[in-house]
């Protein structure tokens, strides 16, 4: 077996019961992106199946964050196709807003409000953006914090958590 084959490991679901299905959820086909004359994304082809966890690794300036930002249209592409669950990525409007509300990404720089507890940080968007009842938002937040293994930290301030724990809260 070659070194490359030995390095391939099975995907372990982040959430039990969310095993990869083989059904494409995110598809990038021949995606191209420029910043002026700088060709940042060159013929990117990627398929992420439902239930898979993807880690994008590469040197600084190689286009990792730019590629991720194109998936929810925080960056536009010059050419190619991006599909979410088989549907073309919306250009703008309500459908795009709905997609952004459903797709979570954490970039190198993420922010938690330093003056709010972990629970308050996680409930802020559902309460303010979706007008969710506070109790319902707290119940949902605790479920999400449990899923990423930081539910016991809910009453702490961000500065009391490790960098990895803070990133999981941001997710």
Q: What do these predicted regions represent?
A:
Residues 10-171:
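ABC family nucleotide-binding domain
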């Amino acid at each position: 077996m070659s070194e490359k084959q030995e390095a391939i490991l099975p995907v372990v679901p982040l959430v039990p019961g969310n095993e990869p299905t083989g059904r494409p959820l995110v598809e990038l086909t021949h995606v191209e992106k420029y910043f002026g004359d700088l060709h940042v994304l060159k013929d990117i082809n990627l398929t992420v199946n439902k239930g898979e966890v993807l880690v994008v690794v590469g040197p600084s300036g190689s286009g990792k964050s730019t590629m991720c930002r194109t998936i929810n249209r925080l960056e536009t592409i010059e050419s190619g196709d991006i599909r979410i669950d088989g549907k073309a990525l919306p250009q703008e409007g309500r459908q795009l807003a709905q997609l952004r509300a459903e797709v979570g990404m954490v970039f190198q720089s993420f922010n938690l409000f330093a003056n709010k507890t972990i629970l308050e940080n996680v409930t802020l968007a559902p309460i303010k953006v979706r007008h969710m009842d506070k109790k319902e938002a707290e119940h949902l937040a605790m479920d999400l914090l449990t899923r990423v293994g930081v539910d016991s930290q809910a009453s702490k301030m961000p500065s009391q958590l490790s960098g990895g724990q803070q990133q999981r809260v941001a997710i």
